[in-house]
């Protein structure tokens, strides 16, 4: 999702202090419900300096209607792959909108891999090598965030997933799909492809496996 003309830095407050002395053109914050109060504080620190702040993530996607208009400059609803290029373009043209919604389902081969190379001081991180083979879930259980109308289900090509696993250079992979066993035929294809790598891995599946 990044272009060569853009310099991107990823900061994680769990590892290091946020550099508020930096003066980026745009700040993006991924928000879950547990970090929402802290996300508001971070946004305020940057916005008082005139820096635009965009919030996205699962909490914004599922509960954007609960977020006051004066907390962030813009909200990103749904998959960032379908909204981030427009957000950056509008920011550059000084036409940033208050809300961006991914209008189309993102095909699995368009799901972006984590930009680990953009993390500053990466030597401080212990990567657990998490992998998405899909995003979302075809079921709409009432208790789950996947019941949101802005949540869609997309499946990545098996070859694409295997290439990311190989790039991780790890013998222990954590698959964090919301529901790994949706398509048994695809699962068998994946198992056949991953077996020669001799990995330890785990995942979550739905109760209908029983």
Task: Give residue spans per PLM region.
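Glycine-rich beta-alpha loop elements in corrinoid/cobalamin-binding modules
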Residues: 2-110
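Radical SAM [4Fe-4S] cluster-binding motif and immediate context
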Residues: 112-210
């Amino acid at each position: 999702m990044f272009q060569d003309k853009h310099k991107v830095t990823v900061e994680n407050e769990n590892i290091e202090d946020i550099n508020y002395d930096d003066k980026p053109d745009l700040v993006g914050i991924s928000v879950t419900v547990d970090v929402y109060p802290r996300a508001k504080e971070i946004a305020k620190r940057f916005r008082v300096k005139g820096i635009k702040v965009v919030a996205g993530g699962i909490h914004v996607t599922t509960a954007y209607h609960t977020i006051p208009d004066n907390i962030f400059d813009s909200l990103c609803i749904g998959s960032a792959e379908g909204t981030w290029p427009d957000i950056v373009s509008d920011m550059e043209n000084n036409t940033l909108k208050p809300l961006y919604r991914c209008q189309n389902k993102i095909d699995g081969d368009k799901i972006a891999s984590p930009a680990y190379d953009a993390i500053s001081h990466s030597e401080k991180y212990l990567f657990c090598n998490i992998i998405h083979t899909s995003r979302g879930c075809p079921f709409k259980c009432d208790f789950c965030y996947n019941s949101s109308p802005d949540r869609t289900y997309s499946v990545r090509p098996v070859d694409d997933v295997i290439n990311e696993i190989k790039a991780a250079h790890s013998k222990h992979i954590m698959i964090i799909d919301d529901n790994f066993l949706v398509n048994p035929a695809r699962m068998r294809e994946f198992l056949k492809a991953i077996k020669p790598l001799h990995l330890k891995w785990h995942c979550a599946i739905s109760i209908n496996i029983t």
